[in-house]
């Protein structure tokens, strides 16, 4: 029963991010505890701000202390482990306390300020979501007159099989208005039911024995001691594409549950969650919860509460699922561990690997990283004994790795084929269609045409708010910026600079879809990119259709490259990858190798052998050739030599300090001043290993009218270095610069902001 509490408030700057002491009203003392979400008066005007209690009985009561406005229900209270994660994130990522809290609690579970019935007193909303919804059942017959509509007939037909909820009927295209009209006629009866917490109740429980090959069993046996030991362990499961890593996951999860413990499974993208959920729910039943950003607020909250109440034994999701309030964790799996999506690009800028390692340490769990193309850092750590290395070298079922052909697109153009689809690719797709098989094509550019260039002055049409070219989207007939969302509608025909004619060039997924339709008019083509998967559950529905062979060809961006498993896919094509070969960032080659290896591995995963074609203007590129050969070990030796020569991770830590603001001169001045302050502080610790580069403009100099500069610091990422950055940030905040820039610190960057 605390009488005073220390509260971290929302919207605090780094310099003012500390605990503020508040008095607790007598009627609140039974509900306030560490981790409580509260509403507090802040500042001279006592404006209402959200906060989290991080200390109790912070100091003796004082007449000067303000009282809490309101306290959220106990269900919104952070668990002790999640509270420790808040402190962990603040220390590791230079975020504020409340930024860490917002990362830990999903948006749908965050209480918001409102006012009491008097219209004045600040309070917290009383309920996050309605936990009930309408349900309808058939109680009468549909009268013949007036003539029933098609929707009314459909509703009656659906409800003939039993009661259904409004949300289930809306998914079938039946609106609430139709249902209410039928209720008024006495055909239906409406009642209130609790919202379903099981999002995938239609998946049948198979509960079949998990049968492993000899090699998979050996991998499982090697990992089992780390799972059974009460101390934390980490391991890297490195297996070629199609080697059956997921089966090893399932066997480990099964044993984890038998031990009375729980499992957390991370996948890098939302597109990969449906297949993983299907495997887990069909094997383990209802006690599987899901956490990712494609769920609506209600779904996320209900899933969160299910986990918090102990109703889930397994949680599967994307990066943010690492913060699930799961207790007694015995196993944490990070699938496709090399993916950049496990690193957050907004505050707090955390790595899911780092948080997973912390949670494994807290729970005495096994942290299992898995990939066919591990990150260079993870494989280096395994080679040097810092984590256990377990290999799967054979494809499941004994299938060979796909044969790969590299096509030189320069030679293709010279021979008279101006199209973006080579003759070899065209022949292979046609042969695959005739055989009744499916094809996956990777093109890492969405849109129709990617560049609008003036024929006279050669100027490229760029976004007015960003220093990047705009992309033409034919379906919407507009130019879009993929960074800030700006658009030109309709697209200009003339150059804004000189009035010359604009020529549209480039090749995106929309144009690829159109060209494929012309070449193969009989083929059913599915496009998978950010535009076609924006709707709720779009990933799941489109992939399910492809699995049912409702499409012959799937063309898409990176989301088609990883983790997908379709038996009838025997051909994979890489249409455009060259731009990534010349991308900025020290992980560029690793990204290309991983992407090509992963997408090639989508073919030939069942009884039929696979084949892949890589189109490129650089056919002798060693990275592409090593990816074509699926030779990770050779790639690693080449990459680690480059990292050592250039002093990049794993041979150092890489910290990027980013600066952004509306005036370039002020951003440049701010970055230079920060660099000077950092140098001054570092000089006090001459034994601290440090190499400072810059400041320089960012890789993309302007985004959304904000100019960007960066300072790159090669360091040893330890507490001592982080304290140095923290001291410098504090000094910078105290400076009275005429125009300051926003500062961010990223310890997991590829080298840019």
PLM region descriptions:
Residues 1-371, 383-399, 681, 719-726, ...:
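Accessory, non-ATPase domains that flank or precede helicase/AAA+ motor cores in DNA-metabolism machines
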Residues 2-4, 17, 46, 436, ...:
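A general secondary-structure signal for short beta-strands and their flanking turns/coil
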Residues 13, 520-523, 678-691, 735-740:
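Short secondary-structure junctions
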Residues 60-75, 696-698, 702-714:
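Solvent-exposed, membrane-proximal periplasmic/extracellular interface segments of envelope transport
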Residues 206-213, 217, 221, 230-668, ...:
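Inter-lobe coupling/hinge segments of SF2-like helicase ATPases
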Residues 672-674:
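Long hydrophobic segments that form regular secondary structure
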Residues 676, 680-703, 707, 743-753:
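A carboxyl-terminal module marker
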């Amino acid at each position: 029963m605390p009488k005073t509490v220390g509260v971290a408030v929302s919207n605090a700057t780094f310099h003012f991010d500390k605990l503020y002491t508040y008095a607790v009203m007598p009627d609140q003392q039974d509900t306030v505890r560490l981790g409580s979400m509260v509403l507090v008066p802040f500042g001279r005007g006592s404006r209402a701000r959200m906060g989290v209690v991080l200390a109790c009985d912070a100091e003796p009561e004082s007449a000067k202390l303000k009282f809490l406005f309101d306290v959220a229900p106990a269900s919104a209270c952070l668990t002790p482990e999640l509270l420790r994660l808040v402190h962990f994130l603040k220390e590791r990522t230079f975020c504020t306390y409340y930024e860490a809290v917002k990362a830990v609690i999903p948006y749908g579970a965050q209480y918001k300020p409102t006012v009491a019935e008097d219209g004045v007193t600040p309070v917290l909303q009383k309920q996050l979501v309605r936990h009930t919804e309408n349900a309808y059942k058939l109680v009468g017959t549909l009268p013949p007159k007036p003539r029933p509509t098609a929707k009314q007939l459909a509703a009656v037909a659906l409800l003939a099989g039993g009661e259904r909820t409004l949300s289930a009927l809306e998914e079938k295209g039946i609106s609430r208005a139709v249902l209410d009209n039928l209720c008024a006629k006495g055909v239906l009866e409406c009642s209130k039911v609790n919202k379903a917490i099981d999002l995938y109740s239609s998946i049948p429980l198979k509960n079949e024995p998990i049968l492993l090959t000899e090699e998979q069993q050996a991998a499982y046996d090697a990992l089992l001691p780390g799972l059974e030991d009460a101390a934390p362990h980490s391991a890297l499961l490195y297996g070629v594409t199609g080697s059956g890593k997921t089966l090893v996951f399932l066997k480990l999860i099964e044993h984890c549950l038998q031990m009375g413990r729980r499992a957390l499974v991370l996948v890098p993208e939302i597109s990969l969650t449906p297949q993983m959920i299907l495997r887990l729910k069909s094997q383990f039943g209802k006690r599987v919860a899901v956490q990712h950003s494609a769920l609506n607020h209600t779904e996320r909250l209900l899933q969160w509460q299910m986990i918090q109440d102990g109703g889930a034994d397994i949680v599967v999701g994307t990066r943010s699922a690492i913060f699930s309030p799961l207790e007694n964790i015995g196993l944490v799996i990070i699938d496709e561990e090399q993916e950049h999506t496990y690193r957050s690009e907004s505050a707090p800028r955390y790595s899911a690997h780092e948080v997973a390692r912390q949670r494994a340490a807290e729970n005495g769990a096994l942290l299992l990283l898995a990939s066919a193309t591990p990150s260079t850092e993870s494989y280096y750590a395994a080679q040097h004994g810092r984590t256990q290395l377990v290999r799967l070298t054979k494809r499941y079922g004994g299938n060979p790795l796909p044969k790969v052909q590299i096509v030189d697109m320069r030679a293709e153009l010279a021979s008279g084929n101006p199209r973006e689809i080579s003759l070899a690719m065209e022949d292979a797709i046609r042969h695959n269609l005739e055989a009744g098989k499916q094809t996956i094509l990777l093109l890492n550019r969405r849109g129709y045409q990617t560049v609008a260039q003036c024929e006279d002055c050669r100027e490229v049409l760029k976004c007015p708010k960003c220093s990047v070219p705009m992309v033409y989207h034919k379906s919407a007939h507009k130019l879009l910026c993929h960074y800030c969302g700006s658009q030109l509608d309709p697209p200009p025909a003339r150059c804004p600079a000189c009035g010359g004619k604009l020529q549209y060039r480039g090749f995106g997924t929309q144009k690829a879809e159109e060209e494929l339709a012309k070449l193969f008019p009989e083929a059913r083509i599915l496009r998978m990119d950010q535009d076609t998967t924006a709707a709720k559950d779009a990933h799941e529905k489109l992939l399910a259709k492809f699995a049912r062979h409702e499409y012959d060809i799937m063309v898409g961006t990176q989301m088609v490259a990883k983790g997908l498993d379709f038996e009838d896919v025997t051909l994979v094509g890489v249409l455009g990858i060259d731009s990534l070969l010349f991308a900025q960032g020290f992980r560029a080659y690793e990204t290309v190798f991983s992407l090509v290896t992963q997408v090639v591995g989508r073919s030939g995963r069942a009884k039929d052998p696979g084949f892949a074609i890589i189109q490129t203007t650089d056919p002798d590129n060693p990275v592409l050739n090593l990816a074509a050969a699926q030779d990770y070990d050779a790639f690693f030796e080449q990459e680690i030599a480059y990292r050592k020569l250039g002093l990049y991770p794993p041979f150092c830590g890489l910290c990027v300090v980013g600066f952004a603001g509306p005036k370039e001169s002020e951003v440049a001045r701010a970055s230079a001043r920060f660099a000077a302050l950092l140098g001054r502080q570092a000089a006090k610790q001459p034994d601290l290993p440090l190499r400072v580069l810059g400041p320089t403009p960012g890789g993309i100099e302007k985004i959304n009218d904000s100019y960007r500069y960066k300072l790159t610091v090669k360091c040893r990422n330890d507490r001592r270095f982080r304290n140095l950055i923290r001291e410098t940030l504090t000094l910078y905040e105290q400076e009275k610069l005429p125009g300051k820039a926003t500062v961010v610190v990223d310890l997991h960057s590829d080298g840019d902001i």
